[in-house]
Regions:
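Carbohydrate transferase catalytic cores enriched for Leloir-type hexosyltransferases
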Residues: 1-353
Length: 353
């Protein structure tokens, strides 16, 4: 009998951001495959919360946490197995491994990270590139990683993100009352308080429209331990919503005048697609990854140009924009967790056939 493919479940010990969302949704999509119960096994640290699955069994591995669990305990358990690592890290000595590296930010924008973190991950990525098979989430990241890791672009597979997880979810409209947003006009921005997410430019743009009742709702705005903090201006119209459930995010997006996505550098960018599936217009920074993902379904601005962003916000406030919303829905339909999972599933066979 063929040994099952092990899935690196370290992501279940980490806060939910875009990379962890990718891992969760890809595993759920793999779990829907008819053969998943025999083909895969999810390996998680002993203290991690389990991911509810129907077919794929889960095994817990004790031992030290973090990178040590991955490099020692998981590496030992996986030595006779193929391994799927979905969050940009994995045992560096394991050759029959497919690793999804989401972007080249530690190479291209090391200023956005704490120096030791950026250095460690540049070393890790280079070692993985020598031993493992790589995938990423966009054509842009494929080109970036190929350049910094000295690989041919076609040596790196592309299995994109999606927003299917928000497609049919019932919105929890109680969040509008809880945040005092019922009946108000507001924009949503999703991300953490790090320089890369560039939320300060959205706050500066907010100061330009002469509307004291307009709000900017920051969802998931928190600091991480690996990036440098970006301070927000003190404006009572900025609503710090914190981490929210998917039904709450769906309600916030459905009620918003638009999503503002002002990132300086991304490998993909899930929030614009999440907005599109909820019928929310998108204003995005004009950077390669967002152009690839959003195409003609978003309004764009230079990521440091708060005046241009304010102008795009006024455009949406003067809506409605039914044609743009339909374009957004069609764009979001181009991305599917199931299709991306199928790409990775096939690659796990073809890479070691």
């Amino acid at each position: 009998m063929t040994e099952p493919i092990l899935i690196n479940g370290r992501f279940l010990t980490q806060p939910l951001s875009g990379v962890q969302r990718y891992a969760r949704e890809i595993v759920r999509a793999l779990d829907r495959l008819p053969h998943a119960g025999l083909r895969y096994r999810l390996m998680i640290p002993s203290g991690a919360d389990a991911l509810p699955l129907d077919r794929i069994p889960t095994s817990r591995l004790s031992g030290p946490g973090g990178h040590m669990w991955e490099q020692v305990r998981l590496a030992d358990a996986a030595r006779n197995h193929r391994l799927l690592s979905l969050c940009g890290a994995g045992p560096v000595g394991h050759s029959r491994q497919l690793v999804v590296i989401h972007d080249a930010a530690v190479f291209r924008r090391p200023d956005l990270f704490k120096p030791r973190y950026a250095l460690a991950h540049r070393i890790l990525d280079r070692r993985l590139a020598r031993r493992a098979r790589l995938a990423t989430v966009s054509r842009f990241s494929q080109g970036e990683l190929a350049a910094v890791l000295n690989l041919a672009p076609d040596a790196i597979a592309v299995a994109p993100n999606s927003a299917d997880h928000l497609r049919d979810i019932p919105p929890d409209t109680d969040i509008l009352r809880a945040l005092n947003l019922a009946g108000r006009r507001y924009f949503v921005a999703v991300g953490n308080l790090t320089p890369n997410k560039n939320l300060a430019v959205a706050a500066r743009a907010l100061a330009r429209p002469p509307d004291p009742d307009l709000r900017l709702v920051l969802v998931g705005a928190h600091l991480t331990g690996v990036t440098r903090a970006s301070l927000m201006p003190d404006d009572p119209r900025i609503v710090m919503a914190g981490r929210r459930t998917d039904p709450e995010v769906a309600a916030l997006l459905r009620g918003a005048a638009g999503l503002v996505f002002p990132s300086l550098y991304e490998g993909f960018g899930i929030p614009p697609l999440e907005a599109m599936v909820q019928g929310c217009p998108v204003i995005a920074s004009d950077i390669p990854a967002t152009r690839e993902v959003c195409a003609d379904a978003a309004l764009y601005f230079g990521p440091t140009d708060d005046a241009a962003l304010a102008d795009r916000m006024r455009t949406l406030l003067n809506g409605p924009h039914p044609a743009r919303l339909e374009t957004g829905r069609r764009r979001a339909d181009a991305y599917s967790w199931s299709r991306s999972a199928a790409v990775l599933d096939a690659l796990l066979d073809s890479a070691w056939s």
